[in-house]
Amino acid sequence: MEQNGSFRVDSEFRYTLFPIVYSVIFVLGVVANGYVLWVFATLYPSKKLNEIKIFMVNLTVADLLFLMTLPLWIVYYSNEGDWIVHKFLCNLAGCLFFINTYCSVAFLGVITYNRYQAVAYPIKTAQATTRKRGITLSLVIWISIAATASYFLATDSTNVVPKKDGSGNITRCFEHYEPYSVPILVVHIFITSCFFLVFFLIFYCNMVIIHTLLTRPVRQQRKPEVKRRALWMVCTVLAVFVICFVPHHVVQLPWTLAELGYQTNFHQAINDAHQITLCLLSTNCVLDPVIYCFLTKKFRKHLSEKFYSMRSSRKCSRATSDTCTEVMMPANQTPVLPLKN
């Protein structure tokens, strides 16, 4: 157990868990989000992006910003929680973690509301000019969340603690709270409350979408595959929230209370759970691109064409290889072996 004038405990399994999970997420996330951004840049001229595509591009950028910090966290946990690079990079990594988490929540929220309007008020939504609104909302989200996260850049988020074997000191990153700090507790209560407010609004909008799609008269429905894609999109957004964001925010407040010393009975168990929810939280960078497949027709078509061309090229490659074999060795002939001396 770590004691440094606070109530901290340690979960040593994280020094193995985080490097593995973050390495996988980094590779998959950079490939997936980089590909998404390339597809958007290739298929959609910037002036033709509608509101929902603007939100999707911003969500991708937020994911990529966080992914760029993962190598720092991989090194940190590989060194058993010792921050060996510049202190400012600790502040920057924490800042981008906060920005990605709550930009993702915000953009998934406005994407859901956009789909809710399209289903609940289709005529009004079709007549609306939404590009300007998409740009405005995106700027508001970025500015408000970045301004809040700038606090992490202005303070020293590292602290020095002795090693367990007593052989020296190590530098922790974002692992120190002043005991019984009321301002920190208030901030965490506010953030957690805001998250669940947004989550319940998203849940309500998605339930309305599902109910409308399932109960709308057949004559008003489009092709069955369109309805099926819409339902899958709703389920995917809810899955991202339930898998990535909800567990972290359920554990966050009890964990904060334990870290501050208000409740220490189950501190170790809560801290263990907190490490797992941090891993789940980071998986949103990999799951977000899945949502795009259900939202844009061109994106799905592009993926289908690429997948089909890859399968065709493999078949052609195998066919060419077989043809070459038949040309080199016809079936009615046998190879001539060299004479032995």
From Swiss-Prot:
Q: Name one GO biological process term.
A: regulation of transcription by RNA polymerase II
Which parts of the sequence lie on the Cytoplasmic side of the lipid bilayer?
39-54, 114-133, 206-233, 296-341
Q: What is the protein's name according to its record?
A: Platelet-activating factor receptor
As one GO molecular function, the record gives: platelet activating factor receptor activity
| A Pfam entry, by short name | 7tm_1
Q: Which InterPro entries match?
A: GPCR_Rhodpsn, GPCR_Rhodpsn_7TM, PAF_rcpt
Family annotation (CDD domains): 7tmA_PAFR
Query: Which keywords, in A-to-Z order, does the entry hold?
Result: Cell membrane, Chemotaxis, Disulfide bond, G-protein coupled receptor, Glycoprotein, Membrane, Receptor, Transducer, Transmembrane, Transmembrane helix
Q: Which residues are glycosylated?
A: 4, 169
Q: Which residues lie on this side of the membrane: Extracellular?
A: 1-16, 75-91, 156-184, 255-275
Tissue spec. comment: Present in almost all organs including spleen, small intestine, kidney, lung, liver and brain.
The record's subunit annotation is: Interacts with ARRB1.
| Similarity remark | Belongs to the G-protein coupled receptor 1 family.
Write out the annotated subcellular location. Cell membrane
Gene name as annotated? Ptafr
- One of the record's GO cellular component terms: plasma membrane
Question: Which Cys pairs are S-S linked?
Answer: 90-173
Q: Where are the transmembrane segments?
A: 17-38, 55-74, 92-113, 134-155, 185-205, 234-254, 276-295
Q: What does this protein do?
A: Receptor for platelet activating factor, a chemotactic phospholipid mediator that possesses potent inflammatory, smooth-muscle contractile and hypotensive activity. Seems to mediate its action via a G protein that activates a phosphatidylinositol-calcium second messenger system.
Q: Which residues form the signal peptide?
A: none
Q: How does it sit in the membrane?
A: Multi-pass membrane protein
Q: Does the keyword Transmembrane apply?
A: yes
